[in-house]
UniProtKB/Swiss-Prot annotation:
Gene that produces this protein: CYCD4-2
CDD domains with a match to the protein in the record: CYCLIN_AtCycD-like_rpt1, CYCLIN_AtCycD-like_rpt2
Cleavable signal peptide: none
Protein name (database record): Cyclin-D4-2
InterPro entries: Cyclin, Cyclin-like_dom, Cyclin-like_sf, Cyclin_C-dom, Cyclin_N, Cyclins_cyclin-box
Pfam family, one: Cyclin_C
Assembly description: Interacts with CDKA-1 to form a kinase complex.
PROSITE patterns: CYCLINS
């Protein structure tokens, strides 16, 4: 079998035309505060970068194994904390995970596939959002139940890329933070870094549960920006900058955030990250077995 070569993650993220808006640079660095057109285009593309519409319903009624998301979520959060990855990386990794799970089934009875998927999603997100990304073996921190060889992770990365149609420049709530903060606070310049940091932290916390999956990325971002800015949702006037949003939906998100910082929607006990016993995967299954199973997954 030919050696797997990792795809060029810088130039081939998705199949959009080359003259489309570069949302990757927007996502990483923020965008000009006057870029209303860019924001409108991002809102139009939200659905392309979201889980399938019935994903939340299937999680709630048991059609999808809810524990799969819990296990992957727990490790991603723990790994990001240990590796000192930021909330942008968490949000992007969870975006990939939810989109993948909404359209692609993992085999039942093979717990290792959940961990491998989590590692692949975090690895892809880190390559976009983080400056210093460790090698794949060093990425697998946090005492995971399984540790995989680099080649196995790379194969899962390729599967994720194909399932997501190479759309990794995802529009998430983080993409709108600076825009909404600037509109709410009337800044002519970038909003205060403290507000941006707090907003990103709150957005990352919303990934811990599933209730926020009901809402669009722009709705979550607007609600978070209003919340951290201390605005009263009933009194705030939704100007033209918010015209594409439904006020009642934004208000509902704000109530969820302000009630308990999203902990009521968290599905991890006491809002903590799950713990997994450490066991090297190579001790239980061969690389050939992993490769064979990954082939069947795709």
């Amino acid at each position: 079998m030919a050696e797997f070569m990792e795809p060029n993650l810088v130039s081939n993220f998705d199949d959009e035309k080359s003259n489309s808006v570069d949302t990757r640079s927007i996502f990483q660095m923020g965008f000009p505060l006057e870029s209303e057109e860019i924001v409108r285009e991002m809102i139009e593309k939200e659905r392309q970068h979201s889980p399938r519409d019935d994903y939340l319903k299937r999680l709630r009624n048991g059609d999808l194994d809810f524990n799969v998301r819990i296990q992957a979520l727990g490790w991603i959060w723990k790994a990001c904390e240990e590796l000192q990855f930021g909330p942008l990386c968490i949000c992007l990794a969870m975006n990939y995970l939810d989109r993948f799970l909404s359209v692609h089934d993992l085999p039942s009875g093979k717990a290792w596939t959940v961990q491998l998927l989590a590692v692949a999603c975090l690895s892809l997100a880190a390559k976009i959002e983080e400056t210093n990304v460790p090698e794949l073996m060093q990425l697998q921190v946090g005492a995971p139940m399984f540790v995989f060889e680099a080649k196995s992770v790379q194969r899962m990365e390729l599967l994720v890329l194909n399932v997501l149609r190479w759309r990794l420049r995802a529009v998430t709530p983080c993409s709108y933070v600076r825009y909404f903060l600037s509109k709410i606070n009337g800044y002519d310049q970038e909003p205060h870094s403290r507000l941006v940091t707090r907003s990103l932290q709150v957005i990352a916390s919303t990934t811990k549960g599933i209730d926020f999956l009901e809402f669009r990325a722009s709705e979550i971002a607007a609600a978070v920006a209003l919340s951290v800015s201390g605005e009263h949702f009933d009194k705030f006037s939704f100007s033209s900058s918010f015209s594409s949003l439904e006020k009642e939906r934004v208000k509902k998100i704000g109530e969820m955030i302000e009630r308990d910082g999203s902990s009521s929607s968290s599905q991890t006990p006491n809002n903590t990250v799950l713990q997994f016993k450490s066991r090297r995967y190579s001790h239980s299954l061969s690389t050939a077995s992993v490769s064979s199973s990954l082939t069947s997954l795709s």
